[in-house]
Amino acid sequence: MRRFAAGCLALALLVLPFVLTGARAAEDESEKEIERYRQMIEDPMANPGFLNVDRGEVLWSEPRGTRNVSLETCDLGEGPGKLEGAYAHLPRYFADTGKVMDLEQRLLWCMETIQGRDTKPLVAKPFSGPGRTSDMEDLVAFIANKSDGVKIKVALATPQEKEMYAIGEALFFRRSSINDFSCSTCHGAAGKRIRLQALPQLDVPGKDAQLTMATWPTYRVSQSALRTMQHRMWDCYRQMRMPAPDYASEAVTALTLYLTKQAEGGELKVPSIKR
């Protein structure tokens, strides 16, 4: 019996490298297929994410709310109604609110103050689903696309921005949940993988952070939907078995500012496409 068990163990150890190699090869082939798909839809008219861009453009100029006005006077940091380059410089401090805000937070504020709109329904269901679009995702896609080709650059010029960055850094390394995970568990070192998928290192400035942050929002092929960084944060927390962060919360803004700072110099290519 011992000889049989030993033989089985030896056989398993012999076969295991080939199994892992085969699985990794399959994963690599999947990545190649996605890359081929990306190349096929370089034409904006072929990327499904641009349907969100088109819907967002309509929403931006559509009169809504109790005041029946559009969002075209909303100041996203570059001046009222100016969209080019705005997304590349967010999150940032806004003097009229006394807060550091990301795009979603700022949009919700503009809806409430300019349009007189109740944003609770938008916050309650911020992400699209089967048979349901999302105004927030569409607006983010449209506005982000106006910064396509612009290099990421966020300021840490005010005390509020510096404090928010420090909070984001602390959140990135904070271990929690039943798994004792943090963002750094997956993204705090080079060469990590999960289910044989490469994980970008996001705790230091560099190419990984640039390629990651510069390609959101993105059309997710596996979900047949456009997803924003807000959704990516929500999904990461879900996978870590942590309570979901509130949509457009200061915690998400802080973490986004920290990650975006690591990605400075990266050229936005949005909406992109991912698996």
From Swiss-Prot:
**GO terms for cellular component:** cytochrome complex; periplasmic space
From the UniProt record, which GO molecular function terms apply?
A: copper ion binding; electron transfer activity; heme binding; iron ion binding; oxidoreductase activity; oxidoreductase activity, acting on a sulfur group of donors, cytochrome as acceptor; protein heterodimerization activity; sulfurtransferase activity
Signal peptide position in this chain? 1-25
Highest taxon of the lineage: Bacteria
Q: Where in the cell is it found?
A: Periplasm
Question: What does the record give as cofactor?
Answer: heme c; Cu(2+)
GO BP terms, alphabetized? sulfur oxidation
Catalytic reactions on record: L-cysteinyl-[SoxY protein] + thiosulfate + 2 Fe(III)-[cytochrome c] = S-sulfosulfanyl-L-cysteinyl-[SoxY protein] + 2 Fe(II)-[cytochrome c] + 2 H(+); S-sulfanyl-L-cysteinyl-[SoxY protein] + thiosulfate + 2 Fe(III)-[cytochrome c] = S-(2-sulfodisulfanyl)-L-cysteinyl-[SoxY protein] + 2 Fe(II)-[cytochrome c] + 2 H(+)
What keywords is this UniProt entry annotated with?
Copper, Disulfide bond, Electron transport, Heme, Iron, Metal-binding, Periplasm, Signal, Transferase, Transport
What the entry lists under Pfam families is as follows: SoxA-TsdA_cyt-c
List ligand-binding residues for heme c: 183, 187, 236
Give the residues the record marks as binding substrate.
Answer: 232
Give the InterPro entries listed for this entry. Answer: Cyt_c-like_dom (IPR009056), Cyt_c-like_dom_sf (IPR036909), SoxA (IPR025710)
UniProt-listed Enzyme Commission number(s): 2.8.5.2
| Subunit and partners | Heterodimer of SoxA and SoxX.
Q: In UniProt terms, what function does this protein have?
A: C-type monoheme cytochrome, which is part of the SoxAX cytochrome complex involved in sulfur oxidation. The SoxAX complex catalyzes the formation of a heterodisulfide bond between the conserved cysteine residue on a sulfur carrier SoxYZ complex subunit SoxY and thiosulfate or other inorganic sulfur substrates. This leads to the liberation of two electrons, which may be transferred from the SoxAX complex to another cytochrome c that then channels them into the respiratory electron transport chain. Some electrons may be used for reductive CO(2) fixation.
Name of the protein in question:
L-cysteine S-thiosulfotransferase subunit SoxA
